């Protein structure tokens, strides 16, 4: 993972910390939800040229253990502190690894371990993440800084020691599993965050602690082992990108590779306990058939939150491909807008296609609770409102608190329903919510895609689009229009796509979407030069048959751990 040597202004995601920090205190434009506040400008400022400095010693002081405290380094026979300009969890991970203290954790602010004394020796430390020692990272140079001791860096390590060496290995043991006091044994698994015990985020027990599994290389054979270990029948889907929400605690397994016949997940190959390069935004999940009546509708072999959800409907017995009538989402194909039902509206936003979701029932309007509210639900709401495809799902009363009853809760749509009320929910008026949890939707609107809708909302026709609209894609800096850096237009700005998980399948979807034939290559690392502006997508994972890039799995809109040195590109073979 490379980090730019420039200072970023605007919201930025610290790698593996999964939280925003606002560099200039700016607020998001009023027409965008909080989840898209990262679309503020991210101009690149004062170019630093990081230079590694030779030093060997560092320590953490003022904390409860040698693995937690204020960071100090030695230079010229004296200890000094490090300024927190540009400091993030990538740098902290290098320190923790060098000290043999595991992985870095978020540090409470401010001044968790007090202010230092003496010189401030380093500023603008820039690590790439793979360094064995902090001395291999760049900085401004010894004693060059613009800081005070209230900016001293503190580091908090989890003191978790992974299995060494970090190479792919078997986790099997000839010894029988050790049973713990709670009845669970080493290597036990569970599924968390789903609708029942047979679907959810995969968690595994190691040394008495539950932890998650990273989705690198995660697939249906791996999910099959989990389902069988739990007695949950066959695997219906293997999910990625924290489909069932972010876990907490340790990430215990990465690059899991099961043949499918193993009796336990711990018997599959992996990098070893605790060895990974992931964040909880990459938590793996599984959906199993279970022992009761089937509860899933139209699930592919690898489900994505954008395309799929589940219903507790005993009549849903089939498993098959997603209906394709509305998969042409953006850019090259017109959207077939559904007829407005008159029973759903979006209010509180900048227009009729962005706002708080309200539904009509028994002659009165009410709101929808954000429990389980996600992109698939927003897709149905946008369709029912006659507003084209969804761009995002919001919660926590983002578009203001509603009035009147909360009419729907725990909505679970597959994404293909004509009306929100057709989706699974707890029942009219059944909820445990307040209006601070009102759900919302951000829709492109027919006008955003260059479409013209008849007044009854039932038909659409393609019309020219003189300027880019939200969701449009382009390839930049190539020799022709079918090769270049991938850029997406959203929130009145063009932004890039990170190359994490970017592969030929994703490139194939994009080439096909742009009418550019087959994909020849999917280079990363800013092959066509680094872009500017926000990084809009990360961890894009396509199955290959999707008709639009945004139908592929990806991390939520407001999250990435990349910089523009990792911009994704494609080379297509025009047909």
From Swiss-Prot:
It comes from the Eukaryota. The gene is SSC4D. Keywords: Disulfide bond, Repeat, Secreted, Signal. PROSITE patterns: SRCR_1, SRCR_2. The lineage of its organism: Eukaryota, Metazoa, Chordata, Craniata, Vertebrata. The keyword Signal applies. Disulfide bonds join 83-147, 96-157, 127-137, 214-278, 227-288, 258-268, 369-433, 382-443, 413-423, 498-562, 511-572, 542-552. It is found in: Secreted. InterPro entries: SRCR, SRCR-like_dom_sf. Induction: Not induced by a combination of IL1A/interleukin-1 alpha, IL6/interleukin-6 and dexamethasone. One of its GO terms (cellular component) is extracellular region. Its main location: secreted. Residues 1-47 form the signal peptide. Residues 58-158, 189-289, 344-444, 473-573 form the SRCR domain. The keyword Glycosyltransferase does not apply. This is Scavenger receptor cysteine-rich domain-containing group B protein. Gene3D superfamilies: SRCR-like domain.
